[in-house]
């Protein structure tokens, strides 16, 4: 969504994995580059897929308070997607780009990518109050970027109270959605045969 909307003003490149499944991060798409809806997409191979049992073990130790600070990098690598070649690309090509947008603080590409190109980094953290923010390894994601783009005022207030980073330039904007041309609650009820219903907005995921 961000990438396609920016193509009106910029040449946009997306650096991403070859994965579809975020549980294992297994390579599925072809490696290399392609043009997709006006966006240059660069796909990098996952150096090692996530083994759910291994991640559950180290994550369980963290949640129980037994993870040492020097083990946090291992946690981030197990969290994935583990893409050291993507980080190498950032370092090698930093001068070719005006800015780097990193979306969602919790994953390896953002955690390590912001450190690699902090002077040009714009973080879109999508942060909320959860245990993983106790990890010191994420501090740079919130304290080192050139700018931060928050989804809500509540997120901004929460992050600034935790990381004392109000001096970093920030804006609030959300992610945006593409609305259908014709939206009719009556047509929805007729199509599905519902009278009363609960509308869920979000991805279909067991954890949600």
Where in the sequence are the language-model features?
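N-terminal subdomain of nucleotide-sugar transferases
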Residues: 1-45, 95
């Amino acid at each position: 969504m961000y990438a396609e909307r920016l193509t009106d003003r910029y040449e946009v490149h997306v650096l991403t994995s070859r994965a579809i499944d975020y549980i294992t991060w297994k390579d599925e798409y072809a490696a290399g580059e392609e043009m997709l809806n006006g966006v240059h997409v660069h796909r990098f191979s996952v150096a090692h897929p996530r083994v759910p049992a291994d991640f559950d073990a180290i994550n369980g130790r963290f949640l129980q308070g037994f993870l040492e600070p020097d083990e946090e990098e291992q946690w981030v690598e197990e969290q994935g997607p583990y893409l050291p070649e993507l980080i190498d690309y950032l370092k090698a090509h930093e001068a070719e780009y005006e800015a780097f947008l990193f979306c969602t603080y919790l994953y390896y590409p953002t955690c390590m990518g912001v450190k690699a190109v902090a002077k040009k980094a714009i973080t879109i953290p999508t942060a909320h109050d959860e245990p993983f923010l106790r990890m010191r390894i994420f501090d740079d994601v919130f304290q080192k970027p050139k700018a931060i783009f928050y989804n809500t005022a509540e997120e901004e207030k929460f992050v600034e109270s935790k990381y004392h980073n109000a001096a970093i330039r920030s804006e609030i904007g959300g992610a945006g959605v593409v609305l259908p041309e014709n939206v009719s609650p009556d047509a929805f009820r007729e199509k599905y045969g519902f009278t009363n219903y609960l509308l869920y907005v979000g991805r279909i995921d067991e954890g949600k």
